[in-house]
UniProtKB/Swiss-Prot annotation:
Subunit structure: The system is composed of three essential subunits: KdpA, KdpB and KdpC.
GO cellular component terms, A-Z: plasma membrane
Lineage of the species this protein comes from: Bacteria, Pseudomonadati, Pseudomonadota, Gammaproteobacteria, Enterobacterales
UniProt family annotation: Belongs to the KdpA family.
Name of the gene this protein is made from: kdpA
Disulphides: none
Keywords: Cell inner membrane, Cell membrane, Ion transport, Membrane, Potassium, Potassium transport, Transmembrane, Transmembrane helix, Transport
Principal place of residence: membrane
Function: Part of the high-affinity ATP-driven potassium transport (or Kdp) system, which catalyzes the hydrolysis of ATP coupled with the electrogenic transport of potassium into the cytoplasm. This subunit binds the periplasmic potassium ions and delivers the ions to the membrane domain of KdpB through an intramembrane tunnel.
Protein name: Potassium-transporting ATPase potassium-binding subunit
């Protein structure tokens, strides 16, 4: 089993790097605006019609607050349109099952969830949403929310390579190029591969079948493959079906499962290569990749070990429980399920091919912790990179205090304003998660949704609030969240968790763009190599430990100890 785990992890990382390196070159060209001439001519007319072009033919650039305003307006418009679509879906076409419109609180929760790249789902798609809502509502927002995150990363990357300017690019141009030149082509290829593996893609009404017991069963249909591709590539995670990627129509084979985890990490990994290329020092991108990969491997091994040890609940009942297969698909097994769980929570994806609620206490704690540290281990498309860069700036600042030098990164001095914004961005999601958890367990409405008692019930609440605050979207289940209290609370946390981080990141970008690049000296801290990688990992672990260890002790740690003591 150890050899199989080693082969799976190493082959996954090797193939990922081989695919991400050339894609990183393409992304670097998009960041620098290096577009083929024939596309430039087409774009020129579009930018001119939209008023985005200067008289000389160059694109008008924005300062950081204009960029932030454009991003915010764009997403609020998407929120309004998606909300309207969901509440009126009964009057719209492609609704063969005649589903009614969603209640306003569920529609608001769903709309905010999808515009924030979270895809938290308090419903099952196959018995709630029409094909039209899935395609023109959710799938479209999967593209646009992913493009938003990548655009913010583009703006931040540019400011490390520029100096003495106050612009970070043009949000409208970035979102358009990311969608048309990056997300759409890759999604089309991945969707075709999924279809070849058996993922369905049709507009047929649900099919009536009879089981071997003679009972009728309604089998849902729909355009799944087209939504599945961007769900994973854009680290969105919202499933066409309630069972998500454990459903055989979404993820039928071991090959499709492997392609899914590759798709989740592909763009976040490629962005690291692109970052190194744009700033003119590939070692900087490689440093981020090494730090991410080390944490990823440790987390994956931890989950595999916990799940291979078996479930003590079954042992207490006298059942043979050498491994914990509860809540998992036999076609994937322990190893493929474990690596999927780590990938989807390390990234802000949230797609699942098993029930995380059925993992062992420690096996479920690791994915939860990966969410809580801000999903910076590869992370979401765009958000993973700018989240990791926040920790890089914090590491540089701490190291500067230790050696008595003014902190700087890539020749830019890191001063008071940048550190205030770093602190704000890093603390906003833990604050939302912990305060939301406290509010939930201290109110009758919150406790009414908890279906499991004790430490595990607390873990389910903590996971849900951590997932929504960090824009992941996965859940432990066992929590009834489709009610007014949870829909509104989680909607607020979803929105604040997304934009409460984006705005400080763009403010940092605006501040760095103005600064001159300082030449490196003998006293400059190298931000590459084993020493800095170790410092970066320790900083991430330290922040995660100080912030969430008390809450994790109340949940999964106590649950594990209770079961262990009962089994003795």
């Amino acid at each position: 089993m150890a050899a199989s785990a080693f082969l799976l992890i190493t082959s996954f990382l090797l193939i990922l790097m081989l695919l991400a390196k050339p894609l990183g070159n393409i992304i670097a060209n998009l960041i620098d605006g290096d577009i083929p001439r024939w596309l430039t001519k087409i774009e020129s007319g579009l930018w001119r019609c939209c008023g985005l072009q200067k008289p000389g033919g160059t694109v008008k650039e924005m300062n950081w607050w204009q960029y932030a305003l454009a991003i915010t307006i764009f997403n609020l418009t998407g929120l309004l349109l998606l909300f309207t679509l969901l509440v009126t879906q009964h009057a719209l076409p492609l609704n063969p099952e005649h589903f009614p419109g969603l209640k306003w609180d569920l529609a608001l929760n769903t709309a905010i969830s999808f515009i924030t790249n979270t895809d938290w789902q308090a419903y099952s798609g196959e018995n709630t949403l029409s094909y039209f809502s899935q395609m023109t509502g959710l799938t479209v927002q999967n593209f646009l929310s992913a493009a938003t995150g990548i655009a913010v990363a583009f703006a931040l990357i540019r400011t490390f390579s520029r100096h003495g300017v106050n612009t970070a690019g043009n949000a409208w141009v970035d979102i358009t190029r990311i969608t048309l030149y990056l997300l759409l082509p890759l999604s089309m290829v991945i969707a075709l591969v999924f279809v070849s593996q058996g993922v369905i893609q049709n507009f047929e009404p649900y099919q009536l079948a009879h089981t071997i017991e003679g009972q009728p069963q309604l089998i849902p249909m729909g355009p799944v493959a087209s939504q599945e591709a961007i769900k994973l590539l854009g680290t969105n995670g919202g499933g066409f079906f309630g069972a998500n990627s454990s459903h055989p129509f979404e993820n039928p084979t071991a090959i499709s499962n492997f392609i899914q985890i590759l798709s989740i990490f592909l763009i976040p990994c490629a962005l690291c290569f692109a970052f190194g290329q744009v700033v003119g020092d590939n070692r900087q991108g490689h440093t981020l990749l090494w730090a991410m990969s080390i944490i990823f491997v440790i987390a994956t091994v931890g989950v595999m070990y916990a799940e291979l040890k078996g479930n003590l609940h079954f042992s207490l009942l006298g059942a043979n429980s050498n491994i914990n297969m509860e809540g998992k698909e036999n076609r994937f097994g322990i190893l493929a399920t474990s690596i999927y769980a780590v990938v989807t929570t390390a990234a802000s994806c949230g797609a699942v091919n098993a029930m995380h609620d059925s993992f062992t206490a420690l096996g479920g704690m690791i994915p939860m912790w990966l969410i809580q540290i801000g999903e910076v281990v590869f992370g979401g498309v765009g958000s993973g990179l700018y989240g990791m860069l926040l920790f890089v700036l914090l590491t540089v600042f701490i190291a500067g205090l230790m050696i008595g030098r003014a902190p700087e990164y890539l020749g830019k001095k890191i001063e008071v304003f940048e550190m205030k914004m770093v602190a704000l961005a890093i603390l906003v999601t833990p604050t939302l998660a912990l305060l939301g958890t406290a509010l939930t367990i201290s109110t009758a409405s919150g406790r009414a949704g908890i279906l499991n008692p004790g430490a595990h019930g607390f873990s389910e609440v903590l996971y849900a609030l951590s997932s929504t605050a960090n824009n992941n979207g996965s859940a432990f289940a066992g929590l009834n969240t489709n009610n007014m209290f949870y829909n509104l609370l989680l909607a607020i946390i979803l929105f604040l968790g997304r934009f409460g981080m984006i705005l400080p990141v763009l403010a940092i970008a605006g501040s760095l763009a103005v600064k001159k690049r300082q030449p490196a000296s003998n006293g400059t801290l190298p931000t590459y190599g084993p020493l800095f990688i170790s410092l970066l990992i320790l900083t991430i672990m330290l922040i995660g430990a100080l912030t969430f260890i008390p809450a994790l002790i109340l949940g999964p740690v106590i649950e594990h100890l209770q079961i262990w003591l009962m089994a003795r």
